[in-house]
Amino acid sequence: MTHTEQGAAQTPTITTVLVANRGEIARRVFTTARHRGLSTVAVYSDADQNEPFAREADAAVRLPGNAPGETYLNADAVLDAARRAGADAIHPGYGFLSENAGFARAVIDAGLVWIGPSPEAIDAMGSKTEAKKLMEAAGVPVLTNLDTAEITEEMLPVLVKASAGGGGRGMRVVRTLDELESETSAAVREAESAFGDGTVFIERYIESGRHIEVQLMADNHGGVWAVGERECSIQRRHQKVIEEAPSPLVERVDGMRDRLFEAARAAAHAIGYSGAGTVEFLANDKGEFFFLEVNTRLQVEHPVTEATTGLDLVGLQFDVAAGFHLPSENPPALDGWAVEARVYAEDPRHDYRPMSGEVLRFDFDDVVSSFTGPHVPGIRLDAGPETAPGRPAVVGVNYDAMLAKVISWAPTRAEAVGRLSGALRRARVHGLGTNRDQLVRILDDADFRAGDINTAFLESTHTEVSTVPLADDDTVSVSAFAAAVVAEADATSTRPTRHVRAGFRLFGDARTTHRYTVGQGSGDAENGVDVDVVRSSRSSGGESVTLGSDRNVRLVAVTPPDGVNRDTGTPATVILEVDGIRRTLTVHRYPGGGVGVDSALGPVMLTERPRYDDPSDIVAEGALVAPMPGTVTSVSVTVGDEVTTGQKLMTIEAMKMEHTISATTDGTVSSLAAATGDHIETGTLLAVIDSPDASDTDNQTDN
């Protein structure tokens, strides 16, 4: 039977697809489904009821609650939603139930089409320990598992890994024997939270390896494609940050691609694989590689493979599920280079602290498509949230911190990297903090540009790219001045017409002070900046200011001259002369005091603050407050304990990751305001540490 004849016979078996997921991956699957004329069904938690993916589907079914266990991990609720909405197929996306063999069986037993590999294949790869045994038997190179009781100092460092999961959750590097028990326990807790299975195993940790993976696509008739490789070596906390296709290492090492593809196909045949999957390897610079795992689902980074092959991998998943053969014996040849950057709501400068709150604006230039392409030079944007004037996107703490994937394609790696760097640098990302600055720093790094990368890139050899913002102190001051100029124009436009322009005096100069916090809200404040706007009646030069660095800034023009409406999202353009060089800055002002300033100097997010601080906002010395909302998962100290700077006090789980709260000073724990299981908000008092130095100072008297 020809492919066309098969299509006529099989396509009607899928008419309505439910996506058992959320965010950008749900929107991605809906895109292909619409292209194929299929109806779409979303499931959504209470926290997601207003998200774009829930609005875009033809039908949406509520999963009551917010926690993953009661919503997106609730197999019975998802199946009931499919029945109620009339879906005849389920696509699991990635994460949540995507690699749950029991769920796959339940879907099939319910008479629905499962758009994924067989439950048997998922089972075979569901336990990483058993998977390694299967791969070793199939001739695929593997790293051996270690017995906890037999680990010695000479074997360190080792890696604790969740057997049931991926994405860096339930994964801990152990560098001393003293940490082995506590880090293993932490990995177990993360694995139980993320995957419902706390099983972990331990293997040798290769410090400077390279993460290489092969995209598989297999049908139900024995056809297997190795659809190119990807390199995902740029990681933080064992989660990928930047991915690319092809791999710079594989391009450089003769014969490595053939060996990788052979190993990947052997892995697929060993478990009778069908559908989309990925075989992950850890490689060294010599081109040697070791099996890590098979991800029995679509990967987050699948767009770079689509961009370099022209394939629609989700469409192929539909075809395989409908019983089609792969359309040819071999996959398309690779064309050009693609790079993907993951934009996370997190602060890399503070141990990747997750950020929650409002995304006020999320705009990128040069976007040629969303969720498909690009197959011409340009940018593809796969984003979960969307913003509009007066309608910010809200990011909570219940789910993963990834906001979007930004993908570039170009004929060469240098062009693709440069295009992505430029798009990220120029993007208008306003509101809560993200890792955008870090992504640009990585892409512009000389070693990254040369392809000299490894999995330790961010954590050891290039830590500075995580801590240096794109905007330096001078740029912050210049941007704050531009914001103050617009604030003055806004104030003038709202005053009665009988008044002259604010700040004008017949003789002498007028000075107005504006205060800003860098970041959005006091919880994000890294520092504050005060700006004096000086208008002179004796000079045609207009407003000017001398910054602390002695750089002179003069206002040339502001458009519109009478201010902007915060609610419409209309920006103001401010032209400044900075040390004799003209600069154009775009200023967006938002309800609530947020101000986004974008220019070639670097992006700056500010928050307007009152001229005088409210005493109630001042945190007492020694008090530790929650840097993020979340749930307290463990408390390691009690009242009266002596602690030292950096000592672990408690852990908080937010966005499916654990975060350590440490002592900021030596002293005694005088108060504990949080207990295990407590749900907390940003700014919640957690503990108070009395410092000996502070006590000595308080007790001093005059002699």
Predicted stretch roles:
Residues 1-279, 283-302:
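N-terminal beta-alpha lobe that positions the nucleotide/phosphoryl donor
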Residues 538-542, 548-583:
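Conserved nucleotide-binding/hydrolysis modules and their immediate coupling elements
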Residues 303-306, 311-552, 645, 678-703:
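Catalytic cores of soluble metabolic enzymes centered on carboxylation/carboxyl-transfer
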Residues 169, 245, 400-406, 620-622:
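Short amphipathic alpha-helical segments
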Residues 615-703:
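Structured functional modules or segments
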Residues 582, 586-626:
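Catalytic P-loop NTP-binding/switch module of NTPases
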